[in-house]
Amino acid sequence: MSRRERRESPFAARVWSVVRRIPPGRVATYGDVAAAAGRPRAARAVGNLMRECRRPDIPCHRVVAAGGRLGGYGGHEALKRSLLLAEGLSFSGSRIIQLDRVRWRRRQKI
């Protein structure tokens, strides 16, 4: 499957829908997004979609790795960190402090 096909797949559309719902100042893990999009074992696929995302309407900087690690951001981890800092999140090294307080989870699948 090509990158373009993956971006335009029904799963990708569900992922974009989930990520758009993450409010400023909150984050979700790749696994959280995968589960909300109906494929709980597809965290890596979500990570790949986030890495490739160039759409300004999708706040992909709000999707982080397990345990609150920043994860990649298309090679721009410093930018991801600065965007999250601007939204009020705090860090210890490359981990979000008090992930449980800022973690957003969609209760139902899309």
Model feature map: region roles:
Residues 1-110:
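Nucleic acid-binding interface residues in structured DNA/RNA-binding domains
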